């Protein structure tokens, strides 16, 4: 475990790889050498970083399958990014989380639509009642018996002794 995390050991392995590549490929003008060296360096770094991480994670975690799956998916995604692909590998857990988030958002929007629809229906009913109250209804005969000034009116024939009881008998003036 100490050798895996030792920086000097890692650097010496990288130097050994570079020396080996230089001895294998004698032509210094080879165009693909930097690319091959960088890919091998990245692979070696991934190897050195992933093994201790997986060992620690497997010891501390109860679910080793998920840890291994997550590490492998991360390594594959890193390699895809290095190769220039924009696509990524996702696990079922990530897909289920995204689906749950989408379903939750859809439920929230449906509740909002339901509330708005209920409010609109209530407003339409209120407008209908207001419209019904404002409609002028044609009436053929107007019933004047309910008018306040028509209740106690008597005609000249109905008055006692033919005199108007509302006319004053005497005129009094103040001095």
Swiss-Prot record:
Q: What is the effect of changing residue 104 to E?
A: In strain: M-attenuated
Residues assigned to the Cytoplasmic compartment are 52-175
Q: What is its main location?
A: host cell
Glycosylation site list: 8, 18
What topology does it adopt in the membrane?
A: Single-pass type III membrane protein
- Locations listed in the record: Host rough endoplasmic reticulum membrane; Host membrane, Host caveola; Secreted
Gene Ontology BP annotations: monoatomic ion transmembrane transport; symbiont-mediated activation of host autophagy; viral process
Q: How is it modified after translation?
A: The N-glycosyl content is primarily Man(9)GlcNAc, with a small amount of Man(8)GlcNAc.
Q: Where does Ca(2+) bind?
A: 120, 123
Query: InterPro entries in the record, alphabetically?
Result: Rotavirus_NSP4
Q: Which GO terms describe its molecular function?
A: channel activity; metal ion binding; toxin activity
Tell me if Membrane is a UniProt keyword of this record: yes
Task: Provide GO CC annotations from the record.
Answer: extracellular region; host caveola; host cell rough endoplasmic reticulum membrane; membrane
Where does the sequence pass through the membrane?
29-51
Q: Which residues are exposed on the Lumenal face of the membrane?
A: 1-28
Alphabetically list the UniProt keywords. Activation of host autophagy by virus, Calcium, Enterotoxin, Glycoprotein, Host endoplasmic reticulum, Host membrane, Host-virus interaction, Ion channel, Ion transport, Membrane, Metal-binding, Secreted, Signal-anchor, Toxin, Transmembrane, Transmembrane helix, Transport, Viral ion channel, Virulence
Similarity field = Belongs to the rotavirus NSP4 family.
Q: What is its quaternary makeup?
A: Homotetramer. Interacts with the immature particle in the viroplasm. Interacts with host CAV1, early and late in infection. Interacts with host integrin ITGA1/ITGB1 heterodimer. Interacts with host integrin ITGA2/ITGB1 heterodimer. Interaction with microtubules blocks trafficking to the Golgi apparatus.
Task: Print the domain comment field.
Answer: Binds 1 calcium ion per tetramer.
Q: What does this protein do?
A: Plays an essential role in the virus replication cycle by acting as a viroporin. Creates a pore in the host endoplasmic reticulum and as a consequence releases Ca(2+) in the cytoplasm of infected cell. In turn, high levels of cytoplasmic calcium trigger membrane trafficking and transport of viral ER-associated proteins to viroplasms, sites of viral genome replication and immature particle assembly. The secreted form acts as an enterotoxin that causes phospholipase C-dependent elevation of the intracellular calcium concentration in host intestinal mucosa cells. Increased concentration of intracellular calcium disrupts the cytoskeleton and the tight junctions, raising the paracellular permeability. Potentiates chloride ion secretion through a calcium ion-dependent signaling pathway, inducing age-dependent diarrhea.
Q: What is this protein called?
A: Non-structural glycoprotein 4
User: Which source organism does the UniProt entry give?
Assistant: Rotavirus A (strain RVA/Human/United States/M/1976/G3P[X]) (RV-A)
